[in-house]
Amino acid sequence: MAHYTRNVGIFVFNQVEVMDFAGPYEVFSLAEDATDMNTFKVFLVAQSAEQIEGRNGFTVVPQYTFDACPELDILIIPGGPGTRAEEKVSKVLDWVRTKADSAELVLSVCTGARILAHSGLLDGLGATTHWNSLNELREMAPTTIVYDDRRFVDNGKNGKL
């Protein structure tokens, strides 16, 4: 069976919740250690190459900008207070839609679902988010089935989300 490395791009932005991007980063990185294969190439992507200040002052520098980002097999949109600003930026929404279109899998963590909703990627699909944002998600994505009793939602292979 042929093996290839999957590119995992994690979008980071100011006021991103550290746990929401660092957790997936660690999980995908450790999966490579467990298999002794180059299964995943995990990297951070932002609008620009500038340092990102996550929640509570934690700083990171993205490896790629939107313009230089390689093709993604997996796109991860983390949450945090910064999603409220990012969901209004057309460049962000356009980039998310473009990368999601060619990705094998798209997922969000917590309030990252807000960005997917504003991108139109949750239309007609199931989703969940932080308990305090459930009603807002229902308002911003009226055709989305918002679950308040689930920690995750899998929309199947064709759903990508």
Where are these regions (language model features)?
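Short, glycine-/small-residue-rich phosphate/pyrophosphate-handling segment
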Residues: 121-139
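Conserved beta-strand edge residues that scaffold enzyme active sites
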Residues: 113-114, 130
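Conserved anion/nucleotide-ligand pocket segment
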Residues: 155-161
